[in-house]
Amino acid sequence: MANDQVILLDYWPSMFGMRTKMALAEKGVKYEYKETDPWVKTPLLIEMNPIHKKIPVLIHNGKPICESLIQLEYIDEVWSDASPILPSDPYQKSRARFWAEFIDKKFYDPSWKVWATMGEEHAAVKKELLEHFKTLETELGDKPYYGGEVFGYLDIALMGYYSWFKAMEKFGEFSIETEFPILTTWTKRCLERESVVKALADSDRIIEYVYVLRKKFGAA
Amino acid sequence: MANDQVILLDYWPSMFGMRTKMALAEKGVKYEYKETDPWVKTPLLIEMNPIHKKIPVLIHNGKPICESLIQLEYIDEVWSDASPILPSDPYQKSRARFWAEFIDKKFYDPSWKVWATMGEEHAAVKKELLEHFKTLETELGDKPYYGGEVFGYLDIALMGYYSWFKAMEKFGEFSIETEFPILTTWTKRCLERESVVKALADSDRIIEYVYVLRKKFGAA
């Protein structure tokens, strides 16, 4: 694996890219990072992900792997000698996959609509977002990490969104620390890991970016 | 595994349930089938899938596994001695997962909207559906099965929709056999398998069901 060529096409604010960066760091995989604005659609992005033309794309020895959750599975399988990402038990694995899918299917939409909408729609979206935070906190329960004692797949899947939490709080007018203390303790625990901290974007820079997006989406 | 208790909560027209039935049959797993109308939300369904309250739910020794693609992975891992479902190579596995996700993220919506919409929306949906069929045919290429020489994960993921093909053709006013001959040859190849044939619902019964749904959705 020493001569592997690993490239990550990613865009700095992407919660999905942050996941992949965490996983690569957990495994100690060195890679070349290529900043790729997904609004631009560079020839390399189109070549590597012709179907969705989205980042992140992980390119391993010339072969593209698309979609962040699929990348986590791939990274875990290929670099299997370092810290495992997915649980080894099939049932625990199915639960981790279920909740990661929940995050992208249910949590994702209100997580950005909370800063992109106004009025009645905003109120409905905020309510939904808070419900999903609650659900995710309940699923964590009193475990240190989602998978139990060890940081892994579902922690990565949700911590990918961490850089966006402050923007959600600002435009949603709520405090994660006040409303979800257990989840907050968990985020602090995850933030003790270098793999997590180094992968995350600065929360204030995300807020500046959100102002740009709000103009783009006509919400400001 | 001989004393395993396996229950499948499923509803006969579900393309997702048909996938799981195919996978269980491929592995030779015996199970109890419990017909579960997802519009009704039985106490057992709510208990086993409290988040989405959707079928299919695979219950293995009392533990629920939700979401059909996650079930395929689970079945492949737990009953690993019989015919493999996923490719063993991590890159091929990532491709199979990518395309299965494409089917549910992109193909699914137009696959039902083609019989649930009218007028301009219908025309747009039909165009999209045909494009996705073309994309899926191109991905198959000249391979006998999606994974190569052996029937597996992505074949199951797409063949789950087969019982609905006739309804798509009828309300979309197109012929899969004429437009997508390579895909048609592949469906015929898959239909030679008992695991597939036994899992599928009758296409004409699906069309009758579509008439019921069209009334429900106000499209008739």
UniProtKB/Swiss-Prot annotation, chains A, B:
GO terms for biological process: glutathione metabolic process; response to cold; response to herbicide; toxin catabolic process. InterPro entries: Glutathione-S-Trfase_C-like (IPR010987), Glutathione-S-Trfase_C_sf (IPR036282), Glutathione_S-Trfase_N (IPR004045), GST_C_Tau (IPR045074), Omega/Tau-like (IPR045073), Thioredoxin-like_sf (IPR036249). It is an enzyme of class 2 (transferase). GO terms for molecular function: glutathione transferase activity. Residues 89-210 form the GST C-terminal domain. It catalyses: RX + glutathione = an S-substituted glutathione + a halide anion + H(+). CDD domains: GST_C_Tau, GST_N_Tau. This is Glutathione S-transferase U26. The lineage of its organism: Eukaryota, Viridiplantae, Streptophyta, Embryophyta, Tracheophyta. Induction: By alachlor, metolachlor and benoxacor. It comes from Arabidopsis thaliana (Mouse-ear cress). One of its GO terms (cellular component) is cytoplasm. Glutathione binds at residues 14-15, 40-41, 54-55, 67-68. In vitro, possesses glutathione S-transferase activity toward 1-chloro-2,4-dinitrobenzene (CDNB). May be involved in the conjugation of reduced glutathione to a wide number of exogenous and endogenous hydrophobic electrophiles and have a detoxification role against certain herbicides. Residues 4-83 form the GST N-terminal domain. Keywords: Cytoplasm, Detoxification, Stress response, Transferase. Pfam families: GST_C_2, GST_N. Its EC number is 2.5.1.18. Belongs to the GST superfamily. Tau family. It is found in: Cytoplasm, Cytosol.
